[in-house]
Amino acid sequence: MGNHNINAEEIALYDRQIRLWGFNAQQALKQSRVLLITASPLANEIAKNLVLSGIGKLCVLDSMTVYEKDVEEQFFIEASDIGQLRANVFKKKLHELNPLVEIDTDTSLISEIDEGKISKFSMVIATQLDYEEFCRINELTRICNASFYATSCFGLYGFAFCDLINHNFAIDRVVDNTKVEEDMFIVQKPMKEAFQSILGETLKPRLAKKIPTLYPAMLSLLKSKKSDPDSIRQVCIEQKLNEKTVLNGEFLSKFSSNISFQWTPVMSVVGGVVSQDALNSISKKQFPIDNFWIFDAESGLAPIYRL
């Protein structure tokens, strides 16, 4: 462990946010060690915000090289970077944003992530993986007692899942015209258990009606990488959800065409929400995502569901 005391240079750089959330919160950020899995366009947004906030260390894990498509989708990447490792390009650009944050890279494959790698970090943020990969990494973060975020964007849609295990935090309340800090505590489920908990046979009718069509649609994408109506219906069958209640024909007809691209505004919103929530959880400020957040840019809705 390095020196986690905030020095004069850092106080000057982070002065505005120290005034906003306090010295202790900034100290907690400096002590944090975050593993960001994949150098995706979404990870681009998240990494930028984390590094500018002054976390202690960020490690970008990605084994891919830069292609022309990356140049089109990521503001970190330029045409001259084609052929280089994405993780190395990320490291260079992130260091330019904030030289005070330690930036590291890992070019391992996703399948090579093990307990030894995860144990070095206090938080893991995984982006653009499939369902099984998300769940496997979440199992490792629980073994290592590390906070976990899973997040992806699909065209006009995005989601974030949060597993902070057992999380203590504080929120500000106004009591008798006086601001007081109230201690809070939540217990969260691992991703696999949380997603299996939405079974139609165990839901009350009132709750079943609140399940958005976007839920089985996204789960179909995560599990099978398929977005056609039949695949989405299959998810409803597996989760014992009432198709007539959950599925919306008009939505299904548009969903497939709305996920075939990466749209920067959506990634900015999702990346901003995930990074801010991660910063809040590190500093133990504000109520975190508990535990599944969906963003629908088409409707402008962004509900949170407690699975």
Curated annotation (Swiss-Prot):
Identify the SUPFAM superfamilies for this entry: Activating enzymes of the ubiquitin-like proteins
InterPro entries referenced in this protein's UniProt entry, alphabetically = ThiF/MoeB/HesA, ThiF_NAD_FAD-bd, Ubiquitin-activating_enz
Which of UniProt's keywords are assigned here?
DNA damage
Give an example GO cellular component term for this record.
cytosol
What is a GO molecular function of this protein? SUMO activating enzyme activity
Report the record's Gene Ontology biological process terms.
Answer: DNA damage response; mitotic chromosome condensation; protein sumoylation
Kindly give the Pfam families that the UniProt entry links to this protein. ThiF
PANTHER family membership: SUMO-ACTIVATING ENZYME SUBUNIT 1, UBIQUITIN-ACTIVATING ENZYME E1
Its function, per the record, reads:
Could be involved in a ubiquitin-related process important for DNA damage tolerance. Acts in a process which is defective in the checkpoint rad mutants and which involves hus5.
Protein name as catalogued: DNA damage tolerance protein rad31
Source organism of this protein record:
Schizosaccharomyces pombe (strain 972 / ATCC 24843)
Q: Which gene encodes it?
A: rad31
